């Protein structure tokens, strides 16, 4: 019991609030579900999420994956999970899908990749944000940042109403950088401001991986993720291991990413190709 497990989840309650969902390879147990969405559709969505993460990383080494609401509440999707109940700019399926994906991807990564959370957090945070961005691009390319609010007369002509959901990442990061509030990604976790630790640092790390993918190619970055995951799954690893893997697959100079982008606050105008 507990062999090769990186986390022990204790749930003490008089009632079992967890539901079990069977995917093709892993049983998912969670108390984070939407009663409006039927169980079959929920299972289909969870299966799609799991296959998506496995496509980028590799197979999950355990038979069960526990996703609890308490952990998700500490790592919400800012701008989505904090909206009042009476404001519903996004469809129920979209909101639950992304909420579960963020919770699942964090559990998946934390349960398999053992990196120093004080120094190498940028890689796990960046990988999770990278997965979120790619998932939305693949399955929800039409969703706007403001959801259905963007269609309201009087608002739809404003530039912000035309932004896609994924545009929030560069928008928030660049705004923070212009205010000189961002911190470098090699800043120790205990020295980060709450805003950088919870939001900006994660966005900056994920965007950095997207910029890197544009620079060296999606094929190379995907192969690097998979090799890093395969070599280090359930073992202690360092972000330098990822650097060595990526560097071995390209002759391009990567110092702009591993030195300037990660270790400084240099203001460079990066763009992501559509």
Short names for language-model regions:
Residues 61-68, 118-119, 142-147, 223-224, ...:
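Surface-exposed patches in mature extracellular/periplasmic domains of secreted proteins
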Residues 1-11:
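Extended, low-hydrophobicity, Ser/Thr/Pro/Gly-biased non-transmembrane segments
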Residues 119, 125-207, 232:
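Acidic/His/Gly-enriched intrinsically disordered linker/tail segments
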Residues 36, 61, 194-274:
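Amphipathic alpha-helical substructures
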Residues 55-59, 71-76, 169-181, 205, ...:
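Glycine-rich, acidic and aromatic/proline-enriched surface loops and short helix-turn segments
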Residues 9-121, 127-135, 139, 194:
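Juxtacatalytic substrate-recognition/specificity segment
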Residues 5, 25-27, 269-273:
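Ser/Thr- (and often Asn-) enriched beta-sheet segments in non-cytosolic proteins
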Residues 96, 115-120, 145, 217, ...:
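Short, surface-exposed helix-loop/turn micro-motifs enriched in polar/charged residues
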């Amino acid at each position: 019991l507990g062999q090769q497990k990186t986390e022990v989840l204790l749930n003490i309650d008089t009632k079992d609030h967890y539901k079990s969902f069977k995917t093709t390879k892993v049983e998912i147990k969670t108390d984070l579900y939407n009663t409006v969405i039927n169980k079959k559709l929920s299972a289909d969505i969870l299966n799609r999420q799991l296959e998506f993460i496995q496509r980028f990383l590799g197979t999950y080494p355990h038979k069960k994956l526990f996703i609890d609401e308490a952990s998700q509440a500490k790592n919400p999707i800012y701008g989505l999970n904090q909206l009042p109940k009476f404001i519903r700019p996004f469809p129920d399926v979209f909101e639950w899908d992304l909420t579960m994906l963020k919770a699942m991807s964090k559990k998946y990564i934390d349960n398999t990749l053992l990196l120093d959370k004080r120094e190498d957090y940028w890689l796990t945070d960046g990988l999770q944000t990278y997965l979120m961005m790619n998932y939305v691009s693949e399955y929800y390319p039409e969703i706007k940042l403001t959801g259905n609010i963007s269609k309201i007369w009087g608002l739809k002509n404003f530039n912000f109403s035309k932004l896609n959901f994924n545009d929030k990442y560069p928008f928030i990061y660049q705004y923070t950088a212009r205010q000189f509030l961002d911190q470098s990604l090699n800043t120790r976790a205990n020295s980060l401001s709450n805003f950088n630790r919870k939001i900006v640092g994660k966005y900056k790390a994920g965007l950095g991986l997207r910029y890197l993918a544009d620079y060296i190619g999606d094929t190379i970055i995907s192969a690097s993720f998979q090799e890093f995951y395969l070599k280090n799954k359930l073992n202690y690893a360092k972000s330098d291991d990822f650097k060595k893997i990526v560097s071995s697959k390209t002759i391009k100079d990567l110092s702009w990413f591993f030195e300037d982008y990660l270790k400084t606050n240099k203001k460079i105008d990066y763009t992501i190709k559509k």
